[in-house]
Amino acid sequence: MSTNFEIVRRQANQDLELFHVAERAVVPSRANGRGIDLHKLTHEETIKLVRRVFFSGATTPQVVVFSGIEHGSGCSWVCARTAQVLAAHVESPVCLVEANLRFPSLHRYFETVVPGDASNLWLLSHGAKQADRQATAGLDRLQSQVSDLRANFAHILIDAPPINAYADAVLLAGIADGLVMIVEANNTPREAAMRAKEVVDAAGIRLLGAVLNKRTFPIPERLYRKL
């Protein structure tokens, strides 16, 4: 990792803070406050997603944006899980970026790394909820940092706000290598999915895959085309 890594840390200090986190992530349980071990959940399905998104083509995308269609799709969970599995299968550094600044949650999924841990997973996160004006300014600063992140990490996964709610996901995907769309199984209206697809297509964004949350596997391309 180059010396630019320290520059990224200093630039992010006031808005987004960079943490070295343990590869084994946890999801807080709303019922009892305990963590649920992500490692035991949908491991095989997530490996398939990692292979499809990052290793199925002639070129490997370095920066990938994850975005749901609407609020409540579980995008942050899918993005966190994908980053954890990816980091466990590569030796190069992986950075998970919190770009959903209005409703940040990634910081709840990971524990800070302990001394001597060989984890190659990093989290660029903001733990406090921001108002629209602050989130817009934070997005601008994050966009300016993408080139530094590219110089320091082999893989960057960005958790973005919903496509149909804000323009953030499309703006970030425009400077990334592609987008993964999260669809909530049995709950996302067909019209909402169609509207999100039209937004992505109109912006010329490369769609790397779509994921049905709660099933967590890529939708075959032939089915996605029917959305």
Task: Locate the predicted segments by residue.
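Conserved beta-strand position immediately N-terminal to the Walker
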Residues: V64
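Short coil/loop residues immediately preceding or within conserved phosphate-binding loops
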Residues: P61
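C-terminal lobe/tail of nucleotide-utilizing enzymes
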Residues: M1-V50, M194-L227
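Conserved Switch II/interswitch segment of TRAFAC-class P-loop GTPases
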Residues: I163-N164, A176-A193
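P-loop/Walker-type NTP enzyme "switch/lid" segment
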Residues: E23-L41, I47, R51, F55-A58, ...
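Active-site signature of alpha/beta-hydrolase-fold catalytic machinery across serine-
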Residues: R81, V85
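Generic detector of well-ordered alpha-helical packing
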Residues: I7, A99-L101, A160, A185, ...
